[in-house]
Curated annotation (Swiss-Prot):
Gene Ontology BP terms: Gram-negative-bacterium-type cell outer membrane assembly; protein folding; protein stabilization
SUPFAM superfamilies named in the record: FKBP-like, Triger factor/SurA peptide-binding domain-like
Known function: Chaperone involved in the correct folding and assembly of outer membrane proteins. Recognizes specific patterns of aromatic residues and the orientation of their side chains, which are found more frequently in integral outer membrane proteins. May act in both early periplasmic and late outer membrane-associated steps of protein maturation.
Entry keyword set: Chaperone, Isomerase, Periplasm, Repeat, Rotamase, Signal
Signal peptide start and end residues: 1-28
Catalytic activity: [protein]-peptidylproline (omega=180) = [protein]-peptidylproline (omega=0)
InterPro entries: OMP_Chaperone_SurA, PPIase_dom_sf, PPIase_PpiC, PPIase_SurA, SurA_N, Trigger_fact/SurA_dom_sf
Organism: Burkholderia orbicola (strain AU 1054)
Domain of life of the source: Bacteria
Gene that produces this protein: surA
Protein known as: Chaperone SurA
Disulphide connectivity of cysteines: none
């Protein structure tokens, strides 16, 4: 599970790089001439290595472009450069550590990762490379970024994630704490929320920009602005179109910080502070409370997805390109009013074809990772682009979602994953701080120093 999650993070980071590399030069130029003056100078010494002004300029351009795409304010040039340089120093230290420890990423592994990234975008590798190069992204730079991401992921797995253990006692205590001593008296909670993305492993500049954006939205919400409209226009969660309405949920299905906030709120009130969650910042408004239906209502919940698909297998006279294009054509026809179930019965090549491709209610972990990631990114009723898995190409449509109390094993798995993720994030932060403290770093430009 850990390796699957780390790979997803690698793919996500590379996808962001692909989108941003296109406009890096223009964004860097927009920050003024300061960077150009430093292009050939050393801006930081990191152990036996250096970071040049040219490298810094390129990264600043990427971050500035990302902020612009998110409609987030771009910090002043000096502040942004300092934040980005600190992030580059941390990255360089980790790369050095990985190389010293003998971590190598061979070409085959890089190619396999790029292949999966291309498939996630519904393309062959050649098509994906062609699109990037047509947009001005040198393939060699993108490939090198992929190698670095994989190297750092492997280093973290070895130094941190692989050492995290979660005991059965911790799992039992977690489940018991979620139920609480008075589970039969607990209340279900109905929230609206606004979610602003800012993963804990994102560049510090991104996190600070996301927090600034979230703070501004929080002030509007506290001042009486229409929360539903704020959520629809700004939230980055899948339920944004619903005004951020989460519906009624048991306390066990919500982050602990959200439940804690609810204890201090009356219906209609907005929590006065941002809530930090692993993937970003939450602004929450308590809509209502209701009595839970007994102790079982407080048990850890899972989100099940009602989904259907069309599968086309590759081989036996059907190439990758043919399978993908056929699904693109089917998708276009369904979007124009065609019957998904009818197409599934006619063309799908798995056992669900006779049911119109209906797979029923799917719980987390019951499908292959590529299918599950695509499914989780879809809104109700939305249809995916062709998705490649080991079985072939899929066209996926989400019909509905629901909360359900998982089996005992599923509840234990949820608890183990939550505990492990919390432990890993804290351990990684501690390890990275120790690694930074044991390294020699000298900044060569004014106004820059170690991040707090």
């Amino acid at each position: 599970m850990k390796k699957t999650l780390r790979f997803a993070a690698v793919v996500s980071s590379l996808a962001a790089s692909a989108a941003l590399l296109v406009a890096a030069p223009a964004a860097a130029q927009a920050l003024g001439s300061q960077g150009a003056q430093l292009a050939d100078e050393v801006v930081a010494v990191v152990n036996n290595d250096v970071i040049t002004g040219r490298e810094l300029d390129q990264r600043v351009g990427l971050i500035a472009r990302r902020l612009q795409q998110q409609n987030a304010p771009v910090p002043p040039a000096d502040q942004l450069r300092a934040q980005v340089l600190n992030q580059m120093v941390l990255e360089r230290i980790q790369v050095q550590k990985a190389k010293d420890d003998g971590i190598r990423i061979d070409d085959a592994t890089v190619q396999a990762t790029l292949q999966r990234l291309a498939q996630a975008n519904g393309m062959t590798l050649d098509q994906y490379r062609g699109r990037l190069e047509a947009q001005g992204v040198p393939w060699s730079i993108f490939t090198n970024d992929a190698r670095t991401e994989l190297m750092l992921s492997k280093l973290r797995e070895r130094e941190v994630d692989g050492k995290i253990t979660v005991s059965d006692a911790e799992v039992a205590n977690y489940i018991a704490s979620q139920r609480g001593p008075n589970a039969s008296q607990q209340q279900d909670l109905r929230f609206q929320h606004i979610f602003i993305k800012a993963p804990t492993n994102a560049p510090q500049a991104d996190i600070e920009a996301a927090q600034k954006k979230a703070d501004a939205l929080l002030q509007q919400a506290k001042s009486g602005a229409d929360f539903e409209r704020l959520a629809k226009n700004n939230s980055e969660a899948n339920d944004a179109k619903k005004g951020g309405d989460l519906g009624f949920k048991s306390p066990s299905a919500l982050p602990a910080d959200v439940v804690d906030a609810a204890s201090k709120l009356r219906p209609g009130q907005v929590n006065p502070t941002l809530i930090r969650v692993p993937d970003g910042f939450e602004i929450v408004r308590l809509v209502d409370r209701r009595q839970s239906q007994g102790a079982s209502a407080a048990a850890p919940k899972i989100v099940q997805t009602h989904v259907r698909h069309i599968l086309l297998r590759v081989g036996e006279g059907k190439s990758e390109g043919q399978a993908r294009q056929q699904l693109v054509d089917i998708r276009n026809q369904v979007e124009a009013g065609g019957d998904f179930a009818k197409f599934a019965r006619t063309y799908s090549q798995d056992g669900s074809a006779s049911q119109g491709g209906d797979l029923g209610w799917i719980s987390p972990g019951e499908t292959v990772p590529e299918f599950e990631r695509a499914m989780n990114n879809l809104q109700d009723g939305q249809i995916s682009q062709p998705i490649r898995t080991e079985y072939g190409y899929h066209l996926i449509q989400v019909l509905n979602r629901r909360e359900a109390e998982g089996s005992v094993q599923q509840q234990m798995d949820i608890a183990r994953q939550a505990i492990g993720q919390r432990k890993a994030e804290q351990a990684y932060a501690d390890w990275l701080r120790e690694l930074r403290d044991s390294s020699y770093v000298q900044y060569k430009i004014g106004g820059v120093g170690p991040a707090n």
